[in-house]
A protein has these predicted regions:
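Periplasmic c-type cytochrome electron-transfer domains
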Residues: 23-791
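Bacterial N-terminal signal peptides that target proteins for export
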Residues: 1-12
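C-terminal motif of bacterial Sec signal peptides marking the signal peptidase cleavage site
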Residues: 18-21
Length: 791
């Protein structure tokens, strides 16, 4: 995402923020006010005789962040044996997992298991059966913030004309959410000795006795293991505690281990880079998604341990994971038990004891007591196999070679031809040049202030490497999300890697906030400050300052503030903040979900131990040599820190202060983009139905001018051909294995609730079992819509 001031790179940020450094002022005329209404501002001045400097990147660093194949990124859950090249169990998991392949089998069975729902109908897969998401249209509406369906009903069947839910240009401002239908309201009673779950039917104030719909659109479970945290609001923590989604935030969470075959003892665990496990243990107990109210994981374990795995569903004998467990004579389910699968998958210390475990006054076996642990770890390992990294764009990106300034010198464009052919068969005509221009718009830097339009590269009739719209500021790296494990622990950009090496916490940063609730104002004087002084902590109000363009001319700007936020979570103006706080909400323990605000709360001292990146300022002398003028004595606690001596880049950031302003309210996780063609409806609200609507949303600068929006979210002024090019690029991110349900994306049969009839009975849709070779019939887009259509 945008930085306060540039890192060592990417120099796209330099062009965007125009605060990379200082150089002698030029005499060029400044841009017009109309051209730079949305320009960003500088809060730092150079020493006398110097001015803002924008220069070429350091040697070996491209002037943009190129899109890369996901094959270049290590799987954060399943490692690779460096000798054989085969998948290998991660070292920290070996203490718990005895057989990785057996655990993956267990995880796939758990994920697709309809009997896990209190009604024996809702599995994890029920909301994630198509490209990792939910493609149903009926009984999917949640009433949103106002509590009413705005002329529709809970059992309403969505149609194309309903979208977009919100669009100021169309006079639409609907707060309904396209969520996922779960279970009917009920209260848990018991599990019988034969695995029958008894519940008492209930009624919900909004949904009555119908299936309830979630208040957030279902995110994809494909590539989900690359996320540092999961769920749109980030509540599924990076570290798994074995019990619930909240990781180390829940100090009481613990599992049990067999200290002997006759004794058990509590065990507190913290398994890092395991947010998929944290996420997996949430829905099975959620009274809207899968469970009767009051059911516990030991009770769910008691039930499933008594039932035939996948006993209500057909499994293909050629299933890439479960085929070996299918009975030779056919029929439904697997020819094994969940108890046997657990004992094969996990170390004996996790299940081998006859001693009872007493929980809430009830006695359970060790296997029942640890069922949440098995569930989370096994599903995480299964989801770690659901990696879509073979799209035509992934294949093409792997062939690109760049020269020192970012021009492509070698490539294999023919790898994009299957996208063109596939769409042509549907009557949708694009070219490989459309895809490549969309890629350019996605990955190339935003042009500097005062430059009209988006000058293309030489390939498309312009000069140089071309310019873009900054998509990959948030959709960064091969993972196409700044919320990735790699970005938040090691860094994707070269500058972030350097910050990590310097001891900075990459989970947070200080950033210019757009605050488009404020009007554009005339230039105002901004007094010089000592180089290196930290203005951002002590001047958090809405102040008007001079914009420094590449020639140093001040033009009208919006008042800008600089606040701290959680990297990877952004408010892009989908809905008003008060309707859903996102990562600005709280966990069940009353603490902020946001790392930034959580660390501010839990540290007693005014300044925390977390070093938060803010940026740097480099100046050049009359000869163009980079220098760092000595700073005057400062009261700022961050003065004098140096990130990269080779580039003389002083840091103007430091420990997170308890008192500094934050911008986390209304922010949601940046999703990855692979298979996005098939993951509609879009955004956490599910309010857009096609990729064209998504691109139009960003072209408008969002739908709501929220105060917590990043400054980069602004009207883009895209032409129709540029919007279509971006859609073409996004379609090229579809992995055909996902589209055709080929291994590892094959699956058991699933009988999916899809609304109710006039008598109140479930309407169901059967998703047939598919084996490793996939299906001849590809999956469909949401409502079978053309991704290039505005409606």
């Amino acid at each position: 995402m945008t930085r306060i001031v540039s890192r060592v790179e990417p120099w796209a940020f330099t062009l965007l923020l125009a605060v990379a450094g200082c150089g002698k002022q030029t005499a060029d005329a400044g841009p017009t006010a109309e051209a730079v209404e949305e320009n960003l501002v500088s809060t730092l001045n150079c020493a006398p005789g110097f001015n803002k400097f924008i220069g070429p990147p350091p040697a070996g660093v491209l002037p943009f962040i190129p899109f890369a194949s996901l094959k270049t990124v290590e799987n954060p859950v399943i490692g690779i044996n460096r000798v054989t090249g085969a998948p290998a169990l991660r070292a920290d998991l070996a203490s718990y997992v005895a057989d990785m392949n057996a655990a993956i089998q267990l995880g796939k069975a758990f994920f697709w298991e309809m009997q896990a729902g209190s009604d024996n109908k809702v599995a994890c897969a029920t909301c994630h059966f198509q490209a990792g998401e939910d493609a149903r249209a009926k009984n999917q509406l949640n009433p949103g913030g106002n509590g009413t369906f705005d002329g529709k009903s809970a059992n309403y069947a969505l149609v194309a004309a309903d979208f977009p839910f919100t669009d100021p240009a169309l006079g639409r401002n609907g707060d309904n959410i396209a969520g996922s239908q779960g279970v009917r309201p009920s209260t848990f009673v018991s599990i019988s000795s034969t695995g029958v779950e008894t519940t008492v039917p209930g009624s919900d104030p909004v949904f009555g006795t119908m299936r309830q719909a979630t208040g957030v659109n279902a995110p994809s479970t494909i590539n989900t293991v690359y996320n540092h945290r999961n769920f749109f609001n980030g509540r599924a923590q990076n570290e798994f505690n074995g019990i619930n989604p909240f990781g180390s935030r829940d100090p009481s969470a613990h599992i049990w281990y067999a200290s002997s075959t006759t004794t058990v003892a509590p065990l507190s665990i913290t398994i890092t880079n395991a947010s998929a496990a944290s996420q997996a243990v949430g829905p099975p107990l959620n009274p809207v998604e899968m469970s009767a109210a009051g059911r516990t994981f030991p009770e769910l374990g008691k039930k499933l341990l008594l039932l035939k795995p996948l006993g209500l569903q057909t499994v293909s004998p050629t299933d890439s994971v479960l085929g070996a467990l299918v009975a030779k004579k056919g029929g439904k389910g697997l020819n094994t038990t969940y108890g046997a699968m657990i004992q094969k998958a996990f170390q004996p210390t996790m299940w081998n004891s006859n001693a009872p475990v007493t929980l809430n006054g009830k006695a359970y076996t060790l296997t029942q007591a640890n069922f949440s642990f098995y569930w989370g770890i096994a599903i995480m390992l299964y989801e770690a196999t659901l990696i879509a990294d073979n799209s035509p764009m992934d294949q093409y990106a792997a062939t690109r070679v760049f020269d020192a300034v970012g021009n492509v010198t070698a490539e294999n464009v023919a790898l994009l031809n299957p996208v063109v052919s596939r769409l042509a068969a549907e009557g949708i005509n694009i070219t490989t040049n459309d895809i490549l221009y969309g890629l350019e718009l996605f990955e190339k830097p935003i042009p500097p202030p005062g430059v009209a339009g988006l000058p293309p590269s030489a390939r498309f009739g312009g000069t140089g490497i071309g310019s873009g719209v900054g998509c990959n500021f948030c959709h960064v790296g091969a993972e196409t999300t700044s919320a990735s494990v790699r970005n938040l622990t090691a860094g994707v950009e070269a500058g972030d890697m350097a910050f990590k090496a310097a001891g900075f916490d990459l989970r947070m940063e200080r950033m210019f906030m757009g605050d488009r609730t404020q009007p554009v104002v005339a230039p105002q004087p901004f007094p010089p400050v000592p180089l290196g002084a930290d203005q951002i902590v002590y001047d958090n109000g809405n102040y008007a300052v001079n914009v420094t363009s590449i020639n140093g001319v001040a033009v009208p700007a919006r008042p800008m503030k600089v606040n701290t936020y959680d990297v990877g979570w952004y408010d892009v103006g989908v809905r008003p903040i008060l309707e859903n706080p996102g990562v600005g909400g709280t966990d069940p323990f009353g603490n902020p979900l946001s790392w930034t605000e959580y660390f501010q709360k839990v540290f007693a001292s005014p300044q925390t131990t977390f070093k938060v990146a803010g940026g740097g300022l480099t100046c050049i002398d009359a000869n163009g040599n980079p220098v760092v003028p000595p700073a005057a004595p400062l009261t700022s606690p961050f003065a004098g820190e140096v990130l990269d001596p080779a580039n003389n880049l002083p840091i103007i950031s430091g420990g997170l202060l308890k008192t500094e302003a934050t911008d986390v309210a209304g922010s949601f996780k940046t999703p990855h983009l692979r298979n996005i063609e098939f993951t509609g409806p879009y955004f956490h609200s599910g309010g857009k139905s096609t990729l064209k609507q998504v691109v139009e949303f960003y072209d408008d600068g969002g739908n709501f001018p929220n105060a917590t929006m990043p400054a980069i979210i602004r009207p883009l002024g895209l032409t129709p051909s540029q919007m279509n090019a971006l859609v073409a690029f996004l379609v090229a991110l579809t992995d055909d294995r996902v589209r055709l349900q080929q291994a590892p994306f094959d699956h058991p049969e699933l009988i999916v609730p899809a609304g109710q009839d006039a008598a109140g009975a479930d309407i169901t849709t059967t998703i047939p079992a598919v084996g490793a070779t996939g299906s001849a019939t590809p999956i469909s887009r949401f409502l079978a819509l053309n991704p290039f259509a505005a409606q």
